[in-house]
């Protein structure tokens, strides 16, 4: 009689309940996985890192050329990628700040340029206005003629004020010095006659006395006297033509 078998059938993948079978299966499958990884490295010159943890928590690893080197390389890529993103964000922020600063500088430059143009225009207009006297009145338009008239009136007003100030100053000078009378010129030699008409309080005519020969009119010093003799005495002479003076 022929023996019957189950034949091929699909085995359901579930966790083994038998502890011994579990350990044996893990050991076989781990060795096979590491063997396949070694073949892949040999055939394709690939870099492989395999880490397996047993049901008890023990770790097993396989790597080519080195597990630690591959792990550091993989982690370094992640850190480098993060650093690259941070650098890009920082660069974008810096560029944005520089663009804002550039915009402000350009606005200030345009404002200064407008101010400069306005100043140059005002200087040109003032320079042209200062040459109004060089142009003939027939060459001026209505606005220029009106401006010229106002300037002439203002100039005339300033000149009149200056003339009035000078006239008032000269008038005060003459009023303050009206009491001063010029002394007569000195005459040397002979008798000096000062017969000029004078009147006293009663209206009677008087005449100045004749000075003796050698009498100095300017210092009233008779002939034969020197200045040393007059230093010890006070000489007071009243001339009828002038008020009382002390010499």
Curated annotation (Swiss-Prot):
SUPFAM superfamilies: SRF-like (SSF55455). Disruption phenotype: No visible phenotype under normal growth conditions. Residues 91-168 form a coiled coil. InterPro entries: MEF2-like_N, TF_MADSbox, TF_MADSbox_sf. It comes from Arabidopsis thaliana (Mouse-ear cress). Plants over-expressing AGL28 show an early flowering phenotype. SMART domains: MADS (SM00432). It holds the Pfam family SRF-TF. Keywords: Coiled coil, DNA-binding, Nucleus, Transcription, Transcription regulation. Its main location: nucleus. Expressed in roots, leaves and shoot apices. Probable transcription factor that may function as a floral promoter operating upstream of known floral activators in the autonomous pathway. It is found in: Nucleus. Gene3D superfamilies: Transcription factor, MADS-box. This is Agamous-like MADS-box protein AGL28. GO terms for cellular component: nucleus. One of its GO terms (molecular function) is DNA-binding transcription factor activity. Residues 6-66 form the MADS-box domain. One of its GO terms (biological process) is positive regulation of flower development. PANTHER family: AGAMOUS-LIKE 50-RELATED, MADS BOX PROTEIN.
């Amino acid at each position: 009689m022929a023996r019957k078998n189950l034949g091929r059938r699909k085995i359901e993948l579930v966790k083994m309940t038998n502890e011994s079978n579990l350990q044996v299966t893990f050991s076989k499958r781990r060795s096979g996985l590491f063997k396949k990884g070694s073949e892949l490295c040999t055939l394709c010159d690939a870099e492989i890192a395999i880490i397996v943890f047993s049901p008890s928590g023990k770790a097993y690893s396989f790597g080519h050329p080195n597990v630690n080197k591959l792990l550091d390389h993989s982690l370094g890529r992640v850190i480098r990628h993060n650093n690259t993103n941070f650098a890009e964000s920082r660069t974008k922020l810096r560029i944005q700040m520089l663009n804002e600063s550039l915009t402000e500088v350009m606005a200030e430059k345009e404002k200064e340029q407008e101010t400069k143009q306005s100043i140059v225009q005002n200087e040109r207009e003032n320079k042209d206005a200062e040459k109004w006297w060089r142009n003939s009145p027939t060459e001026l338009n209505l606005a220029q003629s009106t401006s010229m008239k106002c300037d002439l009136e203002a100039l005339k007003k300033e000149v009149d004020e200056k003339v009035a100030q000078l006239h008032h100053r000269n008038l005060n000078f003459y009023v303050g010095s009206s009491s001063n009378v010029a002394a007569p010129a000195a005459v040397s030699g002979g008798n000096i006659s000062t017969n000029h008409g004078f009147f006293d309080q009663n209206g009677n005519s008087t005449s100045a006395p004749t000075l003796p020969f050698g009498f100095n009119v300017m210092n009233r010093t008779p002939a034969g006297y020197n200045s040393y003799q007059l230093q010890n005495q006070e000489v007071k002479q009243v001339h009828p033509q002038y008020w009382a003076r002390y010499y």
